Amino acid sequence: MEAKWIDLTPENLPNEHLCCIIRTKSAHPGVEAKRAWLAERLQEGHVFRKLDAKQCVFIEYAPLETAWVPVEGENYFYIYCLWVQGAPRGQGFGRRLMESCLADARAQGRSGVCMLGAQKQKAWLSDQSFARKFGFQTVDTAGEYELLTLSFDGSVPHFAESAKQQTVPQRGLTVFYTDQCPYSLQRVEKLREFCTERQIEAQFYHVTELKQAKTLPCAFNNWAVFWNGEFQTVNQIDGAALEKIMGRKKT
């Protein structure tokens, strides 16, 4: 049977699941925060395309100019997430989703498509080895993070200068996050409790405007962690991962 795909729109957004957290029967704060965030982003050309099934199979991308990441460039798409999880894996859905994004970019006369990668694959980033099969290449770096790009016209985007700073003045734990990922709110609350119980100094910065995201002091997709002023990871972490970071082991 041919797969059916759905693009979220202002009309269907209230009633469609958002893939990442679909097993809960009650309203989930992170999902509803993401839904509200998407309601504004869809007006800017943001795309959330998913399999018409109760599964985690989707791609999410936006015009780079309005993507909430410290990456600069003109006329590009930025991919936030491409995720195929569980039983649907191995059926070619990831390839079809990527191909649909690239087709959209070409149809709109875009200069290309970019996404965040790293020297070592991060758990909370899309599979960069998969992207490279389509011709994505590293065009810029910020520490161990890479800007992967498929250019159609020879132009390339780049990390904002602030993203290469990789330091903040705060001590202890510092986290920046957006509502782009529905897991963020719950993760923040659990980390906040963990730090309070152990008397760990912690600051959590909810990024709520595009201009904030565009000037963040590190590579960023929807989450960033600093410890004692030094950038650690874009992975969403729990208490155990924080303890490793405190022991100077990066995640």
PLM features: residue spans?
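Short amphipathic alpha-helix that is part of the acyltransferase structural core
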Residues: M1-D52, S162, R171, P182-Y183, ...
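Conserved catalytic-core motifs of GNAT/GCN5-like acyltransferases
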Residues: L116-G117, R132-T149, Q232
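Non-catalytic, surface beta->alpha helical segment in thiol-disulfide oxidoreductase systems
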Residues: N228-T251
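A conserved beta-turn-beta hairpin within the catalytic core of GNAT-like acetyltransferases
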Residues: A67-I79, R89
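Conserved GNAT acetyl-CoA-binding A-motif
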Residues: A105-A123
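A short, internal acetyl-CoA/4′-phosphopantetheine-binding micro-motif in the GNAT/acyltransferase core
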Residues: Y80-R89, Q119
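Conserved acetyl-CoA-binding loop-helix of GNAT-fold acetyltransferases
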Residues: V84, G90-A105
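Conserved beta-strand in the GNAT
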Residues: K54-E65, Y78, W83
